[in-house]
Amino acid sequence: DQGKLRLSDKFPLMIPQRSARFSTPVAPVRPGTMMSAQGLIELSITRSDNPATDALLAAVGGPAAVNRWMRKAGLSGMRLDRDIATLVRDDGEFNPATTVDLRDSATPLAMVQLLAGLHQGRWLSASSRSVLLGAMERCVTGKRRLPAMLPQDARVAHKTGTLSNTSSDVGIINTPDGRAIAIAVYVTGQGGKPNRDYRIAAISRAVYDGYLTESSSLRRTASR
């Protein structure tokens, strides 16, 4: 939207190279296949493709550039410290169920504020917003997470995340009556990934039912 990059511009996938954990401040990568920015966005969001995500991160100027944008956008409680190759290589340094590591973190509130701003068009043009939300609607990872227990007529645009002993799913639930619910669920521990997925799905359904119940109650009150 700033005119610096176009969706048709091509950038190389950033392929991680073998290296020992914590052996370097930044994990080594090599350039791979050239892809358009739009293709990289599609891979990054729909399939949580790490080389595609790192390609986009490099194209916009790295973690520092992303942090500057977040500050300008008024988003606190969210920070990026490493590229994905380094984050994944060094994953497991801390157990997220018992230790809070503030690096590369976002509070659920900050994530919901980002999602709400994206949905409301606070920062992006309609066309750019459509690209991101469209990719989120086509997400193929996390089918057992946010969407799993929702009614079939509820549409979900979401993005998953998975690291050692932690799973997440964040997105926007669109209800049949046209409302949008921004939701961010992070789960640690729980005895394994299937249990974490189930917990995310259950929370998603509870939030969905809660909003629908509240809406029905307000309509009944207004009709009296």
Walk through the language-model features, giving the residues of each.
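Short, well-structured active-site flanking segments
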Residues: 1-18, 125-128
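A mature extracytoplasmic/lumenal domain signature
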Residues: 11, 15-17, 84, 185-187, ...
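Mid-domain, small-residue-enriched loop/turn segments at the edges of structured enzyme/sensor domains
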Residues: 21-22, 33, 41, 54-115
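Conserved catalytic core of the tyrosine transesterase superfamily
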Residues: 20-23, 73, 82, 177-179, ...
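Short, mixed-charge aromatic SLiMs
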Residues: 15-27, 134-145
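A charged helix-plus-loop insertion that forms the helical arch/lid used to bind
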Residues: 28-35
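Structured C-terminal helix/loop/strand segments within mature extracytoplasmic catalytic/sensor domains
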Residues: 58-59, 63, 112-224
